[in-house]
């Protein structure tokens, strides 16, 4: 990339771990939990956290600022299913879960575990029963925090309903970080006016002031990339709205009915969600939704929603011809409140371009050989850094 712009680097190391994360940010129908994380340590080195590389363990590796391997830690899994990792700046948090096929209200199905920066376990808290048979089913899990409040947005397969089916929806949890107590959660059935989305195939969560702002990939109720802004003040320890403060919501992109196969298919993959100085930014790749039953090539789109949810501007970033290679689900990297880096993979190349606060393109698209992964890139010294690994390479 040209001088003065952000450089993008993928780092490869020849280490024999099982699995691969190549292009794992991408999906066809529903997403999966993010299993690859990279953070910048206080001393300027890098720490990567990888789930699934070693059975029963969370792999933690440290690298120098020049990407030289330094040391490795193996952290025992808490509950059997990994959900997410989060670095709050002062502590690490790991979300895990376990299946509950017998619908046992006394079984812990979600657990949030707090560690110090040396990976010493401090304390954990959890939800029991919670209308959950399979945590993280057909979706993802992400965490954020503001002040002493840790916020979780994920999903689950629910207890069998009156129609005899186990449906899937999103889940939201709030944790008081100093005491590690869950102060609020919602795992029931409601409607989008209360932040409920079903099915929810991908989940994102941010804060804006004292309000939660979340994004879900819905296929039915509603069938859209739906942005939800809670009018409640989560700093009270409670986020779930009452009748008089229902959430504000907007269908960022509505997905037409799909009649050529199962209705779960929406022709879209959401890759990024963030908050700019003026807008809520949503990045995704979709087929030509006007021809959802026949279109196969996906292009990248960025939506900018005003903070009062009154306006919604769709910016088309790519124009790949139908029948050619698709763009993957993109990665959206925040540089500052007015600037973002958008990356997507296509064939054997990575493409990237800078965005303004309103989601419009700032400059030219740059292309280079490489791969993306489910590792959210981090910004350090003007560089976007992520990692890719593959047991076969």
Language-model features and meaning:
Residues 4-12:
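Sec-dependent signal peptide cleavage junction
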Residues 11-393:
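Extracellular, repeat-based ectodomains that mediate carbohydrate processing or recognition
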